[in-house]
A protein has these predicted regions:
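NTP/phosphate- and nucleic-acid-binding module
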Residues: 4-206
Length: 206
């Protein structure tokens, strides 16, 4: 990012005595995220002229009257969100035949913070998987996904930027623990269900 504060006269709006642009390097080059314009006393002068009311401030100590100036920041949410997506998007080479698409969003921006993925749709796992989902969904935006293979589900969550995936497997029924996979490193930890909230709370912003 950079700030461009030098503009030719024909680049300025008629009301602006100076403008600073916050710019981001998009794939097509530098472009504006936000503009901050010094509108001077243009707005209040216009209001005064058309309303017939005096709009000014009297400084008693200096015995002076003056019209306040207006600074106008203008930012677009769409373009800023697009910049976040561009900065986070990566196609990572795993090996000669495998490329992983991952959206490395800051966890605060990720649509889902956690996804619960039962290893199988078999009835033996479903109740426990839903218990785990109920445990996390009240604290973080969470997704529940049981369709296709576990690898394809990991890939889907990587593509939408989910920081943590929780896999409920058949060992969970015995050891009361789940596998937690971190998005960026793909590292996995075995975490007891009764410690899961603490584990995630240490790694996800509140």
């Amino acid at each position: 990012m950079c700030i461009r504060d030098r503009h030719d006269a024909d680049e300025l709006s008629h009301y602006s005595s100076g403008t600073a642009d916050v710019e981001y390097m998009f794939p097509w080059g530098w472009d504006e995220l936000e503009g901050v314009a010094n509108r001077g006393d243009y707005d209040l002068t216009q209001h005064a002229q058309h309303s017939g009311q005096r709009i000014e401030y009297f400084d008693q100590q200096a015995n002076e009257k003056w019209i306040p100036h207006v600074i106008e920041p203008a930012a677009g949410a769409t373009r800023t969100a697009f910049a976040f997506l561009l900065a986070a998007y990566e196609e990572e080479t795993i090996d000669e035949d495998t490329t992983r698409t991952v959206l490395r969003l800051d966890p605060r921006l990720a649509p889902y913070k956690v996804a619960v993925l039962p290893l199988s749709k078999k009835d033996t796992l479903t109740p426990t998987a839903h218990e785990v989902f109920d445990l996390v969904k009240g604290r973080w935006m969470s997704d529940y996904d049981e369709t296709q293979s576990i690898g394809k589900r990991y890939a889907r969550q990587d593509e939408i930027g989910t920081p943590f995936c929780i896999t409920v497997d058949f060992d969970t029924l015995e050891d009361k623990a789940v596998t937690v996979r971190e998005r960026d490193s793909r590292e996995q930890d075995r975490v007891a269900i009764d410690q899961l909230v603490n584990y995630l709370s240490e790694r996800l912003p509140s």
